[in-house]
Swiss-Prot record:
The name this protein goes by in its record: Acetolactate synthase small subunit
An example Gene Ontology molecular-function term: acetolactate synthase regulator activity
Keyword entries, A-Z: Amino-acid biosynthesis, Branched-chain amino acid biosynthesis, Chloroplast, Plastid, Transferase
Family to which the UniProt record says this protein belongs: Belongs to the acetolactate synthase small subunit family.
Classification lineage: Eukaryota, Rhodophyta, Bangiophyceae, Cyanidiales, Cyanidiaceae
SUPFAM superfamilies: ACT-like (SSF55021)
Encoding gene, per UniProt annotation: ilvH
Source taxon at top rank: Eukaryota
Length: 172
């Protein structure tokens, strides 16, 4: 199973190195990692996706708290969240394939951010499922390059059913 951890850290040099070192020493893998400033000055939020089981994540959380500059570690895997990723895709786009590509982009609300005679660079922001879906649909055109951010997530404060919201956004 994949787990999403939200970690608040002091914005100090070496924090990410210590976290990566902990993962390496313990033999844990980081599948996805995103780091950026949090709501408070001097604090950063690290969102990471790690494979494992409940026991592994519990052990990892305890180990993270032992590191200097770690303020808070939350396993938000089972908590309703707003999750987003960004993907940039450079694909082959001949004149004949462009209409089909553009119709796919319209369905996903993706944008063309660069183009040349035979290539397009596309941008999409969405939940990880949406990002994976467009990536799969674009395979047949010939993907040249992909740059994909790690997942970022914030827990929902409302009691709104996340699955219900996903179903509504897919209908629109």
């Amino acid at each position: 199973m994949k787990y999403t951890l939200s970690v608040l850290v002091e914005d100090e040099a070496g924090v990410l190195t210590r976290i990566a070192g902990l993962f390496a020493r313990r033999g844990f893998n980081i599948e996805s990692l995103a780091v950026g400033p949090a709501e408070q000055k001097g604090i950063s939020r690290i969102t990471m996706v790690v494979p494992g089981d409940d026991r592994t994540v519990e052990q990892l959380t305890k180990q993270l708290y032992k590191l200097v500059n770690i303020l808070k570690v939350d396993n938000i895997t089972e908590i309703p969240c707003v999750e987003r990723e960004l993907i940039l895709v450079k694909i082959n786009a001949s004149t004949s394939s462009r209409p089909e590509i553009l119709s796919i982009l319209q369905v996903f609300r993706a944008k063309v951010v660069d183009l040349s005679e035979n290539l397009l660079v596309l941008e999409l922001t969405g939940d990880p499922g949406k990002v994976a879906a467009i990536q799969q649909l674009l395979q047949k055109f010939g993907i040249i390059e992909i740059a994909r951010t790690g997942k970022i997530a914030l827990t929902r404060t409302s009691k709104v059913n996340t699955e219900f919201l996903k179903s509504i956004s897919m209908e629109i």
